[in-house]
C-alpha cells in the first residue's frame, strides 16, 4: 500500500512539474497582486539601460495584455506608477539597486544561466508601492520570464503560428511568492528550418513578397523560439542565404536574443547558397586545389558575425550537403579545422576557444571520427539520429569527458532515402521522449537542434522537443501523456484537452507506422484483413476528430484544424485511397466488376486529398497559410519528390462490366463499415456547413 501511495505521489508531483508553478489566477483572493483590474492593466516599467531584446519582449507583453483584457498597458522608462510590472536583468543599474535594498536575494541569480525569478515586491523603489518584478540572470532569462507571464495569462507561444485564440479576462492576479523555471538542462536549444521548398518558400513569397526569408519573417521565428524557451536557430538554406539575403536578419536575431548557427555542411558562418551563387567565380569546393579562395570565404563569414553570440560550424563536407570525395583523408580535414581556428583567432583577436564552435558528426564525418580524426577540446561534438528519430550513436564514458560537450541533431523532417518525409508529422510522442531521454542520460546536453522542415505542421513535436531540452527530468513513462494534454488545453481550452490529447497521441502513433510518402497499396496485407483494419482505425479517428471540431467554439476551429483535424483527415484519406487501389487491383485480376467501384473510390479520395490541401491553403485562417500545404506526397517512384505533381495511383477498369460473370459480393465491399461510413459522411457535410 505504501508503494502504491508513493507511486501515486511521484506521478502527481511529476505531472505538476511540466510547467512553472502557476502564479496567475483570474479571480481575486487575499493579497494577490492585481495585474489587470476591471479591464485596466498595470503599466510596464523597463529601465532605459536595458537590453534591446528585453525591450522587444516587453513590447510583445504589451500586445499580449491587450489581447487578454482589451487595453494596452503603458510602457514606462520612469518609476511613476503606484503599481506596475518591472522587468530587468541582473547587473543593470535598476536591478542592482533592488538587490542593494535587500528586495531580491543575489544568490538566486548570480552565476546562473538563463534563469528568471518572478515575485511581487512591496515598495521596490521610490514612487512604486507594489510591483510584479521579473528579473533574469541574463537577458534571455528576463525574456523567458516575460513570456512565461504571457503564457500563464493565456497567450499560447503558438498564438501567431497556429492562430490560437486568446481568451479575454477582465481581471488577472499574481499570487504571492517567488516563482522560477530554474536553469535549462541543455545549453543551446533550437530548430533547423530545412527542406523548405516548396511550402515555406512559397508561403514566404506570398506573405512577405520576397524570394527569401527577410528580417520580418525571422522576427516571427525568433519570437516563437523564445516563447518556447529556446535560444538557437539554423536558418533555412536550400535556396536562401540568411546572412546575405537581408543584412537585417542577423541584426534582428542578435537583438532579440536568438543565437544563429549554420547547418552541418555550412562552415564558418557562411551559407551554402553564398558559394553556390558564385561557383563560377569561386571555383571548386575542394580544399586541396582551392584553399586560398575557400579560406577567404571562411574569413568573410567570421568577419561578418562579429558582435553576435553565433556558433561557428567547423569542418568541411562536400559541395551542397554531399559527402567529401573518397580521396579525402583525416589529415586533410584536421588541417581544414586547424586553418579555420587560425582564421577565427586572427579575425576576433582572441583565442579560438572563446568563440563557440560545433563539429557535426553527420553521415561520413562520423566515419572520419571513428578513423581517429579529432578536434580541439573546446569544440562541441554534434551527434545525429538516423534521420528518422532514432538515436544511433552516443558518447561512451571516456568520450563524455570531452570538455566542449556533446550535442544532438534530431529529425522530424527528412529528405533522403528510402523516401522523403516532408508532408506531415510522423513522430510518435513516446518515441521522441524515449530517444531524447536516452540522449540526455548519456550526457548529451550542450546543444540540441531539431530539423523541423517548413516549421508547420510540426507544432507539437517542436513543443515537446523544446520542453525536453529545458528539463528532461520532468518527463517519465507515467506522466508522458500529460504533456500533450497540457499542450491541447493551452490551444483549445481545458474542457477539450482530454479528447484532443487522445486524438493527437493516436494520430502520431498511426503516422509513425509508415510515412505518407512511403505508403502504397502493398503496405498492408489485403488477404488477412490487415488493410481494412488499419484503414478503419484511421477513419474512426477522423470521425472522432470531426465530432470534436464541430463541437468547438468558432474561434478555436482554425487552430484545431491545423494541429489536429487536418493531419488526421489527410492521412485517413490517404489510407482510404491506397486501400481502395489495393482492392481495385485484386478485383480486376479476378475479373470482378466491383473493381470499377473501387476505381471510383481511388479517384474520389485523390480529389479529396487536393480539396483538403486547398482548404488548408486558401480557406483556413482566411488564407493566411497559402502554399504551406502544397508538398507532393502521392506518386513517389524513388526517394525524392522530383515528379511534377501528385499523381493519381494506377487503377484498372473492367470494360462492359455487365457482361462479366456474376460474382458473389465479397467481404471487401466497403472501405469502412457502413455505420461508420454514414457517420463520416454526415460529419463531413457538417464540417462544410
Region roles according to the model:
Residues 226, 231-234, 240, 383-389, ...:
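Structured mid-domain segments that build the active-site/substrate or prosthetic-cofactor binding neighborhood
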Residues 1-22:
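Bacterial Sec-dependent N-terminal signal peptides
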Residues 211-239, 248, 252-261, 307, ...:
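Catalytic domains of carbohydrate-active enzymes, especially glycoside hydrolases
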Residues 164-170, 484-638, 644:
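C-terminal non-catalytic alpha-helical accessory regions
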Residues 75, 166-174, 237-238, 244-255, ...:
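Gly/Pro-rich turn-and-neighbor structural signature
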Residues 158-210, 216-236, 404-407:
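An acidic-aromatic substrate-binding cleft motif
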Residues 20-182:
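Contiguous, structured surface segment used for ligand recognition
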Residues 45-52, 131-136, 194-215, 230-241, ...:
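The substrate-binding groove and active-site-proximal loops of carbohydrate-active enzymes
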Amino acid at each position: 500500500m505504501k508503494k502504491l501511495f508513493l507511486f501515486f505521489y511521484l506521478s502527481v508531483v511529476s505531472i505538476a512539474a511540466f510547467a512553472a508553478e502557476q502564479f496567475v489566477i483570474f479571480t481575486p483572493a487575499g493579497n494577490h497582486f492585481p495585474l489587470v483590474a476591471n479591464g485596466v492593466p498595470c503599466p510596464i516599467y523597463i529601465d532605459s539601460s536595458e537590453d534591446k531584446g528585453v525591450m522587444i519582449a516587453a513590447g510583445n507583453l504589451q500586445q499580449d495584455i491587450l489581447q487578454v483584457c482589451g487595453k494596452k498597458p503603458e510602457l514606462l522608462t520612469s518609476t511613476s506608477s503606484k503599481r506596475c510590472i518591472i522587468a530587468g536583468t541582473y547587473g543593470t543599474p535598476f536591478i542592482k539597486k533592488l538587490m542593494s535594498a535587500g528586495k531580491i536575494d543575489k544568490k538566486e541569480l548570480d552565476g546562473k544561466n538563463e534563469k528568471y525569478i518572478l515575485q511581487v515586491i512591496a515598495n521596490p523603489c521610490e514612487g512604486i508601492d507594489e510591483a510584479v518584478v521579473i528579473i533574469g540572470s541574463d537577458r534571455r532569462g528576463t525574456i523567458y520570464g516575460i513570456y512565461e507571464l504571457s503564457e500563464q495569462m493565456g497567450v499560447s507561444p503558438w498564438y501567431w503560428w497556429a492562430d490560437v485564440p486568446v481568451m479575454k479576462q477582465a481581471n488577472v492576479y499574481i499570487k504571492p511568492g517567488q516563482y522560477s523555471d530554474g536553469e535549462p538542462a541543455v545549453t543551446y536549444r533550437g530548430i533547423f528550418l530545412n527542406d523548405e521548398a516548396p511550402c515555406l518558400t512559397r508561403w514566404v513569397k506570398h506573405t512577405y513578397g520576397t524570394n527569401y526569408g527577410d528580417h520580418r519573417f525571422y522576427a516571427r521565428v525568433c519570437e516563437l523560439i523564445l516563447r518556447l524557451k529556446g535560444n538557437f536557430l539554423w536558418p533555412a538554406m536550400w535556396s536562401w542565404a540568411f546572412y546575405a539575403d537581408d543584412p537585417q536578419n542577423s541584426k534582428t536575431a542578435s537583438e532579440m536574443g536568438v543565437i544563429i548557427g549554420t547547418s552541418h555542411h555550412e562552415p564558418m558562418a557562411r551559407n551554402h547558397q553564398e558559394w553556390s551563387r558564385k561557383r563560377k567565380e569561386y571555383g571548386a569546393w575542394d580544399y586541396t586545389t582551392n584553399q586560398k579562395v575557400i579560406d577567404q570565404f571562411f574569413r568573410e563569414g567570421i568577419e561578418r558575425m562579429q558582435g553576435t553570440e553565433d556558433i561557428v560550424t567547423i569542418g568541411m563536407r562536400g559541395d551542397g550537403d554531399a559527402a567529401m570525395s573518397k580521396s579525402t583523408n583525416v589529415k586533410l580535414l584536421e588541417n581544414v579545422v586547424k586553418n579555420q581556428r587560425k582564421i577565427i583567432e586572427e579575425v576576433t583577436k582572441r583565442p579560438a576557444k572563446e568563440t563557440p564552435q560545433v563539429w557535426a558528426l553527420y553521415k561520413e564525418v562520423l566515419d572520419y571520427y571513428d578513423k581517429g580524426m579529432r578536434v580541439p577540446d573546446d569544440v562541441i561534438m554534434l551527434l545525429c539520429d538516423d534521420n528518422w528519430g532514432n538515436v544511433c550513436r552516443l558518447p561512451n564514458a571516456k568520450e563524455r569527458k570531452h570538455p566542449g560537450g556533446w550535442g544532438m541533431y534530431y529529425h522530424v523532417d527528412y529528405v533522403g532515402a528510402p523516401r522523403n518525409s516532408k508532408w506531415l508529422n510522423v513522430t510518435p510522442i513516446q518515441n521522441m521522449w524515449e530517444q531524447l531521454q536516452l540522449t540526455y542520460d548519456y550526457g548529451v546536453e550542450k546543444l540540441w537542434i531539431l530539423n523541423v522542415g517548413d516549421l508547420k505542421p510540426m507544432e507539437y513535436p517542436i513543443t515537446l522537443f523544446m520542453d525536453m531540452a529545458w528539463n528532461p527530468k520532468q518527463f517519465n513513462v507515467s506522466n508522458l501523456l500529460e504533456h500533450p494534454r497540457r499542450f491541447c488545453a493551452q490551444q483549445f481550452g481545458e474542457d477539450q484537452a482530454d479528447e484532443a490529447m487522445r486524438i493527437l497521441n493516436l494520430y502520431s502513433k498511426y503516422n509513425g507506422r509508415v510515412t505518407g510518402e512511403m505508403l502504397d497499396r502493398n503496405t498492408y496485407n489485403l488477404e488477412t484483413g490487415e488493410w481494412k483494419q488499419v484503414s478503419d482505425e484511421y477513419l474512426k479517428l477522423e470521425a472522432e476528430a470531426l465530432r470534436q471540431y464541430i463541437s468547438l467554439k468558432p474561434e478555436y476551429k482554425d487552430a484545431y484544424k491545423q494541429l489536429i483535424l487536418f493531419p488526421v483527415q489527410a492521412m485517413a484519406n490517404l489510407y482510404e485511397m491506397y486501400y481502395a487501389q489495393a482492392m481495385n487491383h485484386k478485383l480486376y485480376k479476378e475479373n470482378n466488376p466491383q473493381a470499377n467501384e473501387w476505381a471510383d473510390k481511388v479517384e474520389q479520395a485523390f480529389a479529396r486529398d487536393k480539396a483538403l490541401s486547398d482548404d488548408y491553403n486558401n480557406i483556413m485562417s482566411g488564407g493566411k497559410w497559402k502554399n504551406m500545404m502544397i508538398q507532393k506526397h502521392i506518386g513517389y517512384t524513388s526517394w525524392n519528390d522530383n515528379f511534377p505533381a501528385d499523381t493519381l495511383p494506377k487503377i484498372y477498369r473492367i470494360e462492359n462490366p455487365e457482361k462479366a460473370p456474376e460474382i458473389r459480393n465479397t467481404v471487401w465491399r466497403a472501405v469502412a463499415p457502413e455505420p461508420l461510413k454514414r457517420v463520416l459522411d454526415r460529419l463531413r457535410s457538417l464540417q462544410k456547413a
